Amino acid sequence: MGFCGDEPFTVWHNDSGDFSKCFEDSVVMTLPAIYLLIFGMKRLYYLENKKPDLFTLKQLSQDFQTWRKTLQLEVIVSILLVAWKILFFIVIVSIYNKPFEILYSVVTVVQWTVSLGLVYLEMKKGQSRSWEIRLYWVFAFFVATVKLRTLTLAIAGKSIYNVGFLEYFSYFVGYCLILILSITSVLFFDNLESYQNLEENEISKEVNANLFSRLTFWWINSVLVKGHKKALEISDVPTLGEIDQSILLSEKFEKAWEEQLKKPNPSLPWALAKAFGPHFYIAALFKIIQDLLIFVGPTLLKRVLGFVESRDGSQDTYDGLIYALLYFLAPVVQSLLLHQYFHRCYRVGMWLRSAVVTAVYKKALKTSLREGTTIGEIVNLMSVDAQKFMDLCPYLHMIWSAPLQLAISLVLLYRILNASVFAGLGIMLVMIPINLAISNLAKKRQTISMKLKDRRTKAVNEVLNGIKVIKLYSWEQSFMDHVNEIRNKELDVMKAIKYIQGFSLLLWSMSPVFVSVSTFTVYILTGQVLSATQAFPALSLFNVMQFPINMLPSVVSSIIEASVSVARLQKFLLKKDLDPNVVEHHINEPGIAVKIDNATLEWEPNKPILHDINLTIKKGELVAIVGQVGSGKSSIVSSLVGDLDKTKGTVAVNGSVALVSQQAWIQNATLKNNILFAKELNQDKYQSVVQACCLEPDIKILPGGDQTEIGEKGINLSGGQKQRVSIARAVYNNADIYIFDDPLSAVDAHVGKAIFKNVLSNQDGILCNKTRILVTHAVHYLPYVDRIILMKDGRIVEEGDFNTLIEAGSHFTELMSHDEQQQQLQQQQAPDKSSDSNEQIGGGDNKESENNEEQNEEEEGENENLLEKVLRKSRSRSPSPSSNRNIDGDDIASGSILQTTRTPEEDEQDERELMEDIDIDGGENIQTPLQKGEKSSVLKQPLRLLKKLPTSINKKLNNSGSGVSLKPITTVNAKPQDKNKIISVETKQEGKVSFKIYLSYFKAIGVLLATCIIGFYVLTQLLSILANWWISIWTNSYGGNGNGSGSGSISLSSSSTVEDNEKAKYYLSIYVAFSCGTIAATFLRSFSMVFGSIKGSKLFHEKMFKAVILSPMSFFDTTPIGRILNRFSKDQLTIDESIARTLGMFLNTFCQVVGSIIVIAWVSPFIILAMVPVGALFYFIQKYYLNSSRELTRLEGVSRSPIYAHFSETLAGVTTIRAFKDVARFVTENERLLDENQKCYYINISSNRWLAIRLEFLGACLVSCAVLYTVLARSRIEAGTAGLVITYALAITGNMNWMVRMSCDLENSVVSIERIQEYCLLPSEAPLFNDKSVPMSWPSHGKIVFKNLWLTYREGLDPVLRGINCTIEPKTKVGIVGRTGAGKSSLTQALFRLVEPLRGTIEIDGIDITELGLNPLRSRMAIIPQDPVLFAGSVRYNLDPFDQYDDHEIWEAIENAHLLKAIKDLDGGLDAMVQDGGDNFSVGQRQLLVIGRALLKKANIIVLDEASSSIDIASDALIQETIRTKFADCTVLTIAHRLGTIADSDKIMVLDKGELIEYDSPSELLKNQDSIYYSLVKASESKQNIDNDDESN
């Protein structure tokens, strides 16, 4: 007896058409056991090795009663089922003895026992029910149904097998138990883990969704309902589950990537596959089954048409009804499987993006940006390249799925059309090498395209970072040309790629036409008759082939693009990290904080910047590092925080490090949070730090106090305020070692001394017991430090304390002598002191005068009295023609102070205000923290001199914050009512995308071209319909000649006439003509769309960039750079690559749907009755979905901007972040922002699946109705007509689905146009040019007249300049001073028209500047800003972007800027490249280059905003001399932090709260002891004297 007993092993029983009993029991019934063996063992291994969770069944609260009861039911049913299966086994063994029957019974008992074991373990470990068990129960139920059917037929006597009642009853009871388990698995599901990490209101419904809900995406209904009722907000979107969160995904990827890094050739794709592959591979199972179900329709079509042709009643109507039912069930199951596949793939794509973005972010924090990767490139890696991965994932399986579908199609076609199918196969084989060649061409250009995208993004980023300088220099046009030049190159390459892709797509999309034409031609020419049962199933298969054929080139193209992105990402991730061991963190020698031993360090390989450095710093020591510009001071700092590569020696620090960079790094956060820097608040410590850093007065006048939001890069703080916040952050950090990289250069002299005393000094400084390293150019601090390190050419040339170095002479003496030389140069016209001046100054208070005299005697030869120096310098100059004029031009008796009637109360109030805030720049005050009981000797003297100050300078600070240099001009989405906030919240449009947005795209393409494109799509569909309609006529013309049985084809009989043959050729020729017309129309539509999309992309980018660069400064002050970059990267990418493709697919499907409706209505009007309600439901579902999808897309776009903003902010402060060892916090914030963005994307893609399933369900209903109609009307309809109806019904299902989805995708994509259009319509500054012309020599004199000038930054804020009236005569040198919010910067902005006047005018050489275009105004003046900005490009480009000057003039300017040697030493000289932001130059060298710009410009009006703050004393002396000589015939306005800088000015302008308080020569102002200028000079001198007293004591 064999395995099957007496029967042979066969699959089918020939008599009944059912499975044979042996095959059913031994194969079909064991399939669930095989599934359980594969997946159950995996789950068993996991459970055995997992520790129990914190909660078990007994620990669950009342909230989990559903889970508890379901679990109890499942356990009880599983036990009963195992017991019953054992009983069933006994029954089977007692009745049967065949091996396959015994095997079946044993396998059944074992598999259910294993299932029970898994259920028990999951309960014991506190785990949610696994998908492996749930799917097993559902699978087992369906398989058990097959067995039950067999037994039911047998017991009913309709089978050849005999079944007893006992066997049937025992099986039926087991079947009912399986049914219970499958129902619980489908309807009940609680994910216990979700309750551990999330609040109840944050939990996504998906977490606890049952199987039915997951299959149909019912769980997303709650979000869609909310979105239908109102515009969704970010808070309405559920939080990502733990499996989707960036932190977990990053850990998985890092683990896989670390394994790859151990290999000789690390592979990023393999790392991603290792981390996320399993989930992706499981999706392939769904795809395989779905691919097989695709062919149910064509197979059934042949049977349906055969049924229609069998009018003789040989086939029962019941068979036709079964066909109609199958036409409904197969697409529904296919849809459920397809969208589970898509959902998994999209989810994996989202995971890949999270992992890649996080990896790039972390890598940027670990590598040096001097390695050659620009910020623009890194932004593209995060936006464009990561997006390529995400876009590819859903279609990557088509690489094997498409060939599989094509192979099955060809096999089925062969069965229908015999060997003629090989003609079509030959066409396809010919296309493969052609498309491979095309793909290679596309790949090469894709690499170039990505590089150009990087260059463009980098250029735009540079423009945004340097926009203020660009506007001040009127360089907008130059940078527009520069960016547009790169963009045009990018578009040229993109155009080539699109034409290549268009040609490839044309070949593939037309291949079904080629295949059908060639196949039918060969079929007819071989003498065959084409019947309806052959033609329409064949056409249906050709339609099936169309999708994989269309998708294959797109997927190949996407793979090519992704491979380019992989290479770029892999190259970046493989960049060398900064060596974490370059700085050792342990020093064996006790009492040593820093030790550098014989170290040579470099920024770039083989280009050392520091040579043989030997440096030892003791704990608690205060060390100053000095030297000329480019000597290596900042490089020493960089070496201590690990930014430099070490080629030899050792660098070691013992303890934590806090860094204050030379250029202050400020976060977009509140002032308080900037200081705390995520440290826990200690109020007393915080207050003392704020006081020590002289920030208290600033906090008092900020609109929100220390809760005021600081804009991006500290936009609403002055340079001094930013630097003091930076110092406060470091001090609060409580580190062991503090490194100050010349931060005091940004503050005025007396505030710098106050900070030095309060923070750094060995006597009273908060950090007196800490190790302090101070890089400085201010030599007056050097006597008070423990040790001085002198750098020159990257080497330490001298070292010691102040006195030792002075006695030793050499380099240090030379450095100190420069200060004296500078003073002597300024004193050449007045070598002697003025006794008159001394008497005048001394007339204030006798006691204080005596003290000052004693101090001056002690300091004689070391420190000159600043008041005397100012008087001497001012007296030495010729008196200005207007020196005795009033501000308005009228004579007044008391110099230039505006007198008003005052009361004693006002005087007292003024004294209190001045005690708190005597300031001459953006917030620099002289208040110092005093110990309890300490006398305020610091402020006593100046206060006594200021008792009679006028009331006009001491008005109370208003609540609007106008006393602070906030510049929130009204801009897009600004919220002026919130005065604590500077950065506007990015909002989104709500509701349906306006038709104007679509119209703007068509206008960008060109109305005529857009009309032609639409016409070509209509023509293509019309010709396609005519071809199919002709097939229907063709097949109907043969009447009953077709073989209705569907056995294949019939040959022409011997009686066939030549006429019949000619008739077939006639029909074939017309069909070929229509097909050729379709090909031609497709060609025209494809290439016209490419041409139009390129034209539209170019126009949108140009308009947006022009609108952005011409926007007022207020826009940039309130808009983060990351938000703007988002428009230029992701949104522009959507217009470049997505919209045209999506629009084309929508137009195509729309034409197909309309065409199908026309054909169906024409052939069978009755089906319209079914189409009306189905169409209505289509519309309702689409509208219901679109309300939410549209808002989710907008939210996804809005939430993407903070990622880029955070990234840009991080890169700007990466050195500080690394020094503070705070990398982990910033990584966590990046992950949080990424998750906020991804949750919108995830819900959006899930809603897409929700939509598709419902639309395809309606489509299945429509097809079923069409088949039902043909079945019921077979007596009145021809087979060819029926084939046409069903073919178009099948087509309209998919097409209507795709049309709705493409319309939704199109609207979602058009959101990018909406966002770009928003920027295209930004309000602009005044035009660069207008009708008003001025001579080329204007301004020839440089006379400036302010007439009643009022200025406000935006409507609703108080004016920042109030009635300024004064005249600056030609060639006058004016020093501008004032305290916080005085209006100094506002005056400069008004002069350059960065802000337009509220009222009043400014005239230059008699011309009202508001009548001029901005270009002639700004380009005829020169400004040297405090923050030097350089752009990537050559040195020549940075000095002369318009190529206006020859090499001789440029070299002369460089020489006068004292940078000649540094530039000549560069490879390439003037053509040497400047890195992003000038990173390959020191800050001082950057400042000198900026001075070179002004020298090259040769303007008659020069504005200096602390032009030499970052320059050493020696260079400063030379620069000051250059300014005096080269700008001698110019009008010069100098905003001063150091009073010495303006001591020799012709006039001093004192501003306070927007009012001009004093305007006269320094000598005249110093004669009046009540003048503010006198008090400032005296205060500075007093502070210096007190410091000297403290030192001597």
Curated annotation (Swiss-Prot):
Record has Disulfide bond as a keyword: no
Annotated residues for binding of ATP: 627-634, 1378-1385
Domain of life: Eukaryota
Domain named ABC transporter: residues: 594-818, 1344-1578
Coiled-coil region: 844-875
Entries under SMART domains matching the protein: AAA (SM00382)
MF terms (GO), sorted A to Z: ABC-type transporter activity; ATP binding; ATP hydrolysis activity; ATPase-coupled transmembrane transporter activity
Transmembrane segments: 27-47, 75-95, 100-120, 135-155, 169-189, 280-300, 318-338, 392-412, 419-439, 505-525, 1005-1025, 1064-1084, 1157-1177, 1251-1271, 1280-1300
InterPro entries tied to this protein: AAA+_ATPase, ABC1_TM_dom, ABC1_TM_sf, ABC_transporter-like_ATP-bd, ABC_transporter-like_CS, ABC_transporter_C-like, P-loop_NTPase, TMD0_ABC
Stretches with biased composition (Acidic residues): 851-865, 905-922
Domain ABC transmembrane type-1 residue range list: 280-561, 1010-1308
Alphabetical UniProt keywords: ATP-binding, Coiled coil, Membrane, Nucleotide-binding, Repeat, Transmembrane, Transmembrane helix, Transport
UniProt biased composition (Low complexity): 877-886
Record's GO cellular component terms: membrane
Membrane topology according to the record: Multi-pass membrane protein
Annotated localization: Membrane
UniProt keyword annotation of Transferase present: no
Cystine crosslinks: none
Residues covered by region (Disordered): 816-938
GO BP of this protein: culmination involved in sorocarp development; sorocarp morphogenesis; transmembrane transport
Pfam family for this entry, one: ABC_membrane
Signal peptide: none
Family statement drawn from the similarity comment of this UniProt entry: Belongs to the ABC transporter superfamily. ABCC family. Conjugate transporter (TC 3.A.1.208) subfamily.
Full protein name: ABC transporter C family member 8
Biological source species: Dictyostelium discoideum (Social amoeba)
